[in-house]
């Protein structure tokens, strides 16, 4: 999901707005990491992603008056090969996920953020 209603949502900002927040001292980019996998017959496959995005959004909103913070859309293709036999699962290779996180971190720095918070909800 892409949250465009939150004031801390990167996806809802223009490029100049992102840069303005990122270039402030102490800026933080929060990247929620979830998964898309089976959770039995009773829960949605996006449970981990839904939960981590909610926690990240609420946390970032609570500190936004005191800290320059933005929140990316969640990364939803985690590392879950052990769930594949049950169906309802999309997984990445571990190295692919690791590379993606490194590239997100490099992009955060390139945009001017001082720090990065990878929030693992899986």
Language-model segments: which ranges?
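Short helix-capping segments at alpha-helix termini
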Residues: 61-67
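Glycine-rich loop at the start of a catalytic domain that most often binds anionic cofactors/ligands
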Residues: 42-50, 84-85
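Short coil-to-beta-strand
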Residues: 24-33, 67-79
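Residue-level signal for alpha-helix termini/capping positions
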Residues: 23, 64, 109-110
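Active-site histidine-anchored catalytic micro-motif
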Residues: 8-11, 77-121
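Active-site and ligand/interface coordination hotspots across diverse enzymes
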Residues: 1-44
């Amino acid at each position: 999901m892409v949250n465009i209603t939150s004031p801390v949502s990167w996806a809802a900002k223009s490029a100049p707005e992102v840069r303005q927040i990122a270039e402030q001292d102490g800026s933080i980019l929060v990247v929620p990491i979830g998964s898309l996998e089976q959770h039995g017959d009773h829960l949605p496959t996006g449970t981990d992603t839904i939960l981590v995005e909610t926690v990240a959004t609420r946390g970032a909103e609570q500190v936004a008056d005191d800290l320059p913070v933005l929140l990316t859309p969640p990364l939803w293709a985690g590392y879950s090969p052990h769930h594949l036999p049950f169906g309802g699962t999309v997984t990445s290779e571990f190295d692919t996920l690791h590379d993606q996180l490194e590239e997100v971190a490099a992009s955060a720095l390139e945009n001017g953020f001082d720090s990065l918070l990878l929030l693992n909800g899986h």
